[in-house]
Amino acid sequence: VVVQPLEHGMIDRLNGQDCLYHVNLQGKENGKPVDTTTRIDVISRALNPYTQFEAFMALSEQPDMRFVISNTTEAGIAFDATCKFTDRPASSYPGRLVQLLFHRYQYFNGAHDKGMIIMPCELIFLNGHRLKECIYQYIELWKEDFGNDYEGFKEWFTADCYVCATLVDRIVPGFPRENIDEIQHKICYKDNLVVKAENFHLWVIEKAENMTVAQLQEEFPAHKAGLHVLITDNEKPYHMRKVTLLNGPHTVLSPVAFLGGINIVRDACEHPLVGKYIRKVQFDELMQTLDLPEEELNKFATDVLERFENPFVDHQLTSIMLNAFPKFETRDLPGLKIYLERKGSLPQGLVMGLSAIITYYKGGKRQDETPILPKDDPKIIEKLEELWSTGDTRKVAEGVLAFDYVWHEDLNKTIPGLTDMVKEYLDLIQTKGMLEALQSIL
């Protein structure tokens, strides 16, 4: 059963197609193109809790209902103190979930085997921990509404419901407008809800505190279906792996490749110089900062490169460049610091990437006359304009690295040698061009 998170959405269209739709997976696997279309027929019905509140609450009365899986966006897991228990429904997702759970608790008289396994997929680090906090906040907020059932319900939720933290990893562009006619011809009817996604998928599920990994594997045996679902007792290393080996290289390859005359990620990976640079950053630098088994990291990094080289997706470098400084701060700076600590030297590839970001924010035009149009927080744009207006790369390097608004520290002082290396690379890019500057570190 699908429950719509917002008052207005796609429920009517989904029900209008008898809850049937297709998923078109495209990408590379073992170096070969993959393009499959599969009909999804596992949804029995779709509900709008704003217009079908009774039907929504009745879901909790089904004895075999065991899992709640959500994806309400990052803003969805939030506590709203204005929500009332008597709202039909509560305006927030955690509030609606508590309404559902309390009804189930009462309907089954607090039966221990009627708890729910809850798996949020929102892109928040340790999303399950945050959701659990919100649930407890609502339990306290609505304490008087629960009356004599307050203590019992709270104990039942704590002991018999299982809130997991998860990490989802799959690029889903959505409705394939560019080739929908071809897909509809292939499936022989008009599906207006086709979803396009890459073939790669990974779902890491951190078991709830009150259960074991073995218990969750038994209840949710996704591996038997051949799905890449990893059940663990700690999601953090996998979160760090994704941020470090997928998002990290993305952030630095984009300015380097764009300034080198390239426009899409796939072409960057296939470029003899930029492709070599990406592998240097990924395998020689960022991978060295993680503490998972080397074989596992190599496999993940290789999969990431296949994803970057997806022949079906033209991923524009300029779209990745949006908010590049905050992205570098969260995705690459931690690895730069760990690399320096472990190796005793600065990672040239990451520093070159940072220097390319700084150069990108100078604006202007590429050699082929393509405009360079940085997009970021106005404070960051203004700061870079001010620094570049000096015409002094030493002042640019020092000013950027001292910019507390981005780094929350003065990198000139906290990372020895970084200022000089950034200045050196800025000079190289200005005088030799991006590709020749890149050649100097490969």
Indicate where each model-derived feature is located.
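Substrate/ligand-engaging "lid" and interaction regions
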Residues: 1-442
